[in-house]
Amino acid sequence: MKILQVDQPQSIDFDTDVLGCIAGPNCDFSWILDIRDQCIKKKILFRFLSTGPALIKDGKIYSIPKNQQVSQARKAQIDYSPNEDLFCRLSHSQFRSSFYLRPKDRTYIQQKGWETIDEHAHDFIAARLGPAIPYHDGKQTPMKGHPVFLAQHATGTCCRNCLYKWHQIPKEKDLTDKEQDYICQVIMDWLFRQMSK
């Protein structure tokens, strides 16, 4: 995951699977929308995380108090997910849709920050799902203890059988870096959705 502070028009010329966007001081909203459009073209998960203290929209400058910058970004409703079909299918599973973040999980995410949570996801996936035949496959992901574990169960990324069933990722072969990035993108997408509720 990359967190990008936008203080001028820019192109996405870096490799990432998840982009969190924060408006810098005096950012023009059209710059945020342009970055979102680039994410859509590249199928990069995009989240508008914060407006910043002043946002320019249609030539007007809006001063936004610090305690409202996150909620105003959510209110813009410009987030993009390349995983909509997957989340629609997951919503029909009683088991998958029974997972949600508890207050302590939300607090943990807020304290650690999105980049750290993404690092944890990559570490867990590499260690627990990366090998062709993971140790204790089917039981390697705890049901609690970390927000990423909850997200794995909610998204069918908890074991190699579920990866095959929900994501058509073949079993009994090492996961490629691209597959691991995709899995982490799905996990982060679920966490973003939960934190927005």
PLM regions with names:
Residues 153-165:
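Local cysteine-cluster metal-coordination motifs and their immediate loop/turn environment
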Residues 1-3:
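Conserved SAM/AdoMet-binding glycine-rich loop
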Residues 135-155:
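Immediate flanking context of iron-sulfur cluster ligation sites
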Residues 133-135, 171-178:
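Short, surface-exposed acidic
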Residues 160, 167-174:
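Glycine-rich active-site/cofactor-binding loop and its immediate structural neighborhood
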Residues 6-16, 20-79:
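Auxiliary Fe-S-binding modules of radical SAM enzymes
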Residues 80-125:
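Core of compact, soluble alpha-helical bundle domains
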Residues 182-197:
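Short Fe-S-cluster ligation motifs
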